[in-house]
């Protein structure tokens, strides 16, 4: 399977109805922290940062006191869906992470992309992967 095509064509694409608006960075990462595919702009993350994300999916609320860290950037964790979606905010941008059976789908955005648009793009691909048993 060509995971890079999913990142390029389904995550880093123009937002529907908003030509030129797209995520800042995106990736698909295995539960073990291995990168399956990523945009050129996706931050280099530390293993402990990915461990924190996985722990929060298994123990919702784990990241709330400390924030979500990715590539040295700290995001304030905002409402998500326990065990399924983590959302974070930093200034005028943020992050959405959708958990599938085998992977995590990451989307990072800055204005003019809205949190809702990022959620839609990331969760749509995540839901598709779940339907495919991935």
UniProtKB/Swiss-Prot annotation:
One GO CC term, this protein: cell cortex
Keyword Phosphoprotein: yes
Post-translational modification (record): Phosphorylated by MAP kinases.
Disulfide bonds: 13-118
Protein family according to the UniProt entry: Belongs to the profilin family.
Protein function: Binds to actin and affects the structure of the cytoskeleton. At high concentrations, profilin prevents the polymerization of actin, whereas it enhances it at low concentrations.
Name of protein: Profilin-2
Taxonomic source organism: Olea europaea (Common olive)
Taxon lineage: Eukaryota, Viridiplantae, Streptophyta, Embryophyta, Tracheophyta
